[in-house]
Amino acid sequence: MIDSEQLKQNVVKAVEEIRATNPMAGSITNTVTLDFVANAQLAVGGSAAMVYLPDEGEALVAGGGAIYLNMGTLFPIYEQTIPRAAKAAHDAGKPWVLDPVGLGIGSLRTQLVIELKQYKPAIVRGNASEIIALAGLWGLEGEAADLSRVRGVDTTDTVDAARDAAVALARYTGGAVVVSGEVELITDGTTVAMSHGGSPLMS
């Protein structure tokens, strides 16, 4: 059972540590959310840098504490940038976040996501359809991935329907999985928590 008071204290402690250390978390993200992602990182006390080139992604991993990889807008150069950044983080033992936006749109996106499996992200964040498709694509839960069910950034599944897929992903990566929605699901593969701080706009 989750101790909600202890959880709150842990969140406060984490925020205080971020503000005290001002960690660098690089981002390779889509063009739609560049400003929002950078400002969110700055708002909690971190330091942000948004890059595109392969060597820049690797450099940010080397000099920073983590990296965020959002697959929403894929440029041809990302075929090198994204896997190299993920590999650099994995090899350095640094956490990285995978946001598999639009999984199922085009062969490049699908192949990149398959390649990223070996680097085990510390956090996976996606809507219900993306999480279900990712677990299927990685062969972790249920039948083979039905990528036709993923409609860009929109979900065709409920958060609760993604529960088993989220747990399977978290157990494989050894990290955490967040299924976004009006009520968000968060799991480490053992414990499942529901957060009522989400938004229907995140579905």
Model feature map: region roles:
Residues 1-83, 88-90, 164-203:
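Small-residue (G/A/S/T)-rich helix-start motifs and N-terminal tracts that mark the onset
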Residues 70, 78-127:
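Glycine/small-residue-rich loop that forms an oxyanion/phosphate-binding "nest" at active or ligand-binding sites
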Residues 107-192:
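Conserved phosphate/ATP/ADP-binding segment of small-molecule kinases
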Residues 66, 88-96, 132-144:
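Hydrophobic transmembrane alpha-helix bundles
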Residues 23, 40-43, 67-72, 95-101, ...:
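Short, basic, glycine/proline-bearing loop/turn elements
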